[in-house]
Amino acid sequence: MDNKSQRRNNENQKKVEALDFLSFMRRPNCIAEILRQHTQIIEESNNYYYLKMKTKDNKSQGPLRSLLCLPKNVNQKTDSAFCSVDGYNVKNKFLCTRSPNQDSLYQFWSMAYKKNIHIIVMLSPIDNLMRHRYWSLEEDEVFECREFRIETLQVDVQAFYITTTLQLKHENGAVRKIVHFNYTGWPVDNISHHPKEFISFILTVNSARDEVDKLSARNSHTLGPIMVHCSDGFNNSCVYCLLDICISEFGATSNVSVPNTFSKIRQQNRHAISQPENYVYCYQALYVWISSISNSLHH
């Protein structure tokens, strides 16, 4: 790494306070800087995976696998992937995956059962799932998937999301409630976002997680990760993870570092936020949220 790249890397690792973050976002060239960050971090993560694979014994795997650097948690048989992502000071807070199709429907519910999932966050438009829907939209209806029975107990429709309380029952008699959050405000063009509403949605999910955590502690159960899914499993889903981490870190320390957070996520999910517009959106959403907090403190 040359001196210029090293300096930029050091800048990316910095945690900044609210006023510095807001000042950066008001610069005329901030978008260009954000895009440069995105390109640099992707290059660094690609090098990280290449070197990681290179140090292993790949003789039996062949050169193609070394170049692709396929993550271990990719199930090539079903073409579905489940990737754990750490939260802020929370190990494996998220389990990111792609929205299930007919071939991966059973793997989806099987993983939800095995990982003790209590919260599902869906970031795909519901219209995209009509052919491969994995739960019933109407209260008291039941969706069946092999040994799993998923009953819809309650549906609550809000402006930008739908909360559905599900009951997951295994044929062995085990029963668990799952809160399903479907964010309906993600734009089709991937540009016309509603940052304030999306941040509010993330905070709502975290409040629900806190309630489930308290209940799990009382019953001596282990709280599973939040299962987050989108069309590909690593763009919208990892945007959600990145914003959640930055919000949590800012709430605890009053500091934030988007590039540092992004770099850590890329080490767990090689393909995370590969679309530059999604990375820009992370900054824009945090700008709206931190601005609102800053304004409220000065009034």
Curated annotation (Swiss-Prot):
Residues 16-289 form the Tyrosine-protein phosphatase domain. Pfam families: Y_phosphatase. The active site is at C230. Its EC number is 3.1.3.48. It catalyses: O-phospho-L-tyrosyl-[protein] + H2O = L-tyrosyl-[protein] + phosphate. Transmembrane segments: none annotated. Keywords: Hydrolase, Protein phosphatase. It comes from the Viruses. CDD domains: PTPc (cd00047). One of its GO terms (molecular function) is protein tyrosine phosphatase activity. Signal peptide: none annotated. Belongs to the protein-tyrosine phosphatase family. This is Probable tyrosine phosphatase protein J4. It comes from Microplitis demolitor bracovirus (isolate Webb) (MdBV).
